[in-house]
């Protein structure tokens, strides 16, 4: 069996919703969940109209494969969550993500943003001595408001070891299914 980390649109109460990562154990039970704390307010991202910041704090989730420090998307830009998870015994940091370029960004700016995204998460690995799995969406999503040409998600899912070394890098523009062995004893 496998442990699965997935995202969902969670209704906590009438009119109160969260972008939530759910961790499912090998037997299908829910091991835990994490509600996204940082809600972006950038062009073509409209999460602030749907989601409330999380209220569960930063706590690792115990599973049969280890203690997982799970955060969602934009949370990856802030070092505090990774550090708090590590200090509480997380053995692996996982970031399910949907991030990309706003359509009007120049190619050079697009690449700088993507590289910054990779660098900050590799920094979490190095600073905390933990492997990181960053899973990102790929493809295009039009802007329903018509204010921009939408978001081109930059893919580039990756896995890195505790020294920030790449164990796997996916392409920018295609969906892939890959199994990566991560040495949790390092």
Language-model segments: which ranges?
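Active-site catalytic loop in hydrolytic enzyme cores
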Residues: 12-123
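Conserved hydrophobic/aromatic positions in well-ordered beta-strands
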Residues: 22-24, 158, 178-180
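Flexible, acidic active-site loops/lids enriched in D/E/S/T/G that coordinate Mg2+ and/or position polar
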Residues: 4-7, 11-12
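CN hydrolase (nitrilase-like) catalytic-core segments centered on the catalytic cysteine
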Residues: 1-5, 73-177
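Residue-level detector of high-confidence beta-strand sites
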Residues: 7, 20, 33, 169-171, ...
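Short loop/turn motifs at secondary-structure junctions and domain boundaries
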Residues: 11-16, 148-152
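A short C-terminal boundary segment appended to hydrolase-like catalytic domains
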Residues: 185-186
């Amino acid at each position: 069996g496998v442990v699965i980390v997935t995202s969902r649109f969670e209704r906590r109460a009438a009119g109160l919703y969260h972008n939530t990562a759910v961790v499912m154990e090998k037997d299908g039970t829910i091991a835990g969940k994490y509600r996204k704390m940082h809600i972006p307010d950038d062009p073509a991202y409209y999460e602030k109209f749907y989601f409330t910041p999380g209220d569960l704090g930063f706590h690792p989730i115990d599973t049969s494969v280890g203690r997982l420090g799970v955060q969602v998307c934009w949370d990856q830009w802030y070092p505090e969550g990774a550090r708090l998870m590590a200090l509480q015994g997380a053995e692996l940091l996982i970031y399910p993500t949907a991030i990309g370029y706003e359509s009007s960004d120049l190619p050079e700016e697009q690449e700088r943003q993507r590289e910054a995204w990779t660098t900050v998460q590799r920094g979490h690995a190095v600073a905390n001595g933990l492997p990181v799995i960053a899973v990102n969406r790929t493809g295009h999503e039009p802007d329903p408001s018509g204010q921009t040409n939408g978001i081109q998600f930059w893919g580039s899912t990756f896995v890195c070891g505790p020294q920030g070394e790449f164990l796997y890098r996916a392409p920018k523009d295609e969906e892939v299914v890959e199994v990566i062995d991560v040495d949790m004893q390092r």
